[in-house]
């Protein structure tokens, strides 16, 4: 993992509260990617210049080299890949908690953020914590992240029903393109599994009174996975109000902004490998 401290001279507190540390999980379809990709590094500088610490982690790529499988086979492989990534995220989190004094990190102020596969990992990790599943048992009892920021993420559930059974999720900010053809904006059901993106999750969060912000980018696609640098104002508002001040400010916005990046990605579904 790489650890980036707030820039010298930056403002690291607001009203006596220390700004959280952002725990970043990179994207790449569970096939590729690394913690030092250029888009993320630019965003890390934005955050550290503004007084936030950043930790960027690695994780096992559970779909690396996978080709020529059926849809039924693939959903099982996808579940395994997500589980591996979540396990590694929890391992990194446990390390940060154990070494908090020497690293200068406050475990109660860890915000996990991710892009694409990393966003799936972040959302899925919070889902596992809130349901008390065995994979989350490696974390200290009662631990939860201070927040989640998802750039084009989703969760994978069995049985079709999204349930946070043990506890409410932490404050969660989700950004997603309404025309995302790689990670579902709404949901995909296959062989007893449901792959649920922002639209499906926002319905559950709204219906249960959870603390969340949903930003839906009209007619944009998976480009939103790289919107970290372009949405700093939204992130800082979420971090300062929902996370630091613990002010439940729910937002559900449909955004049409042609100035934001749009990269054609074709019609193939990343999670439908032939």
Over which residues does each language-model region extend?
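A short loop-to-beta-strand scaffold at the N-terminal edge of the catalytic core in hydrolase folds
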Residues: 1-13, 21
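The feature captures the conserved acid-bearing segment of alpha/beta-hydrolase catalytic domains
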Residues: 13, 136-208
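Short beta-strand element of the alpha/beta-hydrolase
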Residues: 16-29
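Short amphipathic alpha-helix adjacent to the substrate-entry channel of hydrolases
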Residues: 35-57, 64
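Alpha/beta-hydrolase active-site loop
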Residues: 75-102, 197
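Primarily recognizes the serine-hydrolase "nucleophile elbow" in alpha/beta-hydrolase
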Residues: 94-168
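C-terminal catalytic histidine-bearing segment of alpha/beta-hydrolase fold enzymes
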Residues: 206-274
């Amino acid at each position: 993992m790489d650890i980036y401290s707030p820039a010298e001279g930056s403002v690291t507190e607001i009203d006596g509260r220390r700004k959280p540390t952002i725990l970043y999980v990179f994207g790449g379809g569970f096939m590729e990617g690394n913690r030092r990709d250029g888009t993320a590094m630019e965003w890390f500088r934005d955050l550290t210049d503004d007084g936030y610490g950043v930790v960027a982690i690695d994780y096992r790529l559970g779909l690396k080299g996978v080709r020529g499988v059926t849809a039924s086979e693939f959903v099982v492989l996808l579940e395994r890949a997500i589980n591996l990534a979540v396990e590694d995220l929890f391992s990194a989190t446990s390390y940060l908690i154990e070494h908090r004094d020497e690293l200068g990190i406050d475990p109660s102020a860890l915000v996990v953020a991710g892009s694409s596969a990393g966003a799936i990992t972040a959302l899925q990790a919070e889902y596992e914590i809130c349901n008390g599943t065995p994979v989350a048992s490696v974390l200290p009892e009662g631990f939860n992240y201070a927040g989640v920021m998802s750039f084009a993420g989703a969760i994978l559930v069995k049985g079709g029903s999204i349930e946070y059974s043990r506890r409410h999720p932490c404050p969660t900010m989700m950004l997603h393109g309404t025309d995302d053809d790689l990670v579902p904006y709404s949901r995909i059901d296959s062989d007893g599994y449901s792959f649920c993106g922002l639209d499906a999750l926002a319905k559950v969060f709204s219906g249960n009174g959870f603390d969340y912000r949903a930003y839906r980018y009209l007619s944009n696609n998976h480009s939103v996975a790289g919107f970290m640098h372009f949405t700093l104002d939204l992130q800082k508002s979420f971090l300062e109000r929902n996370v630091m001040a613990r002010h439940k400010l729910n937002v559900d916005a449909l955004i049409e902004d042609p100035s934001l990046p749009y990269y054609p990605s074709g019609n193939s579904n990343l999670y439908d490998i032939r």
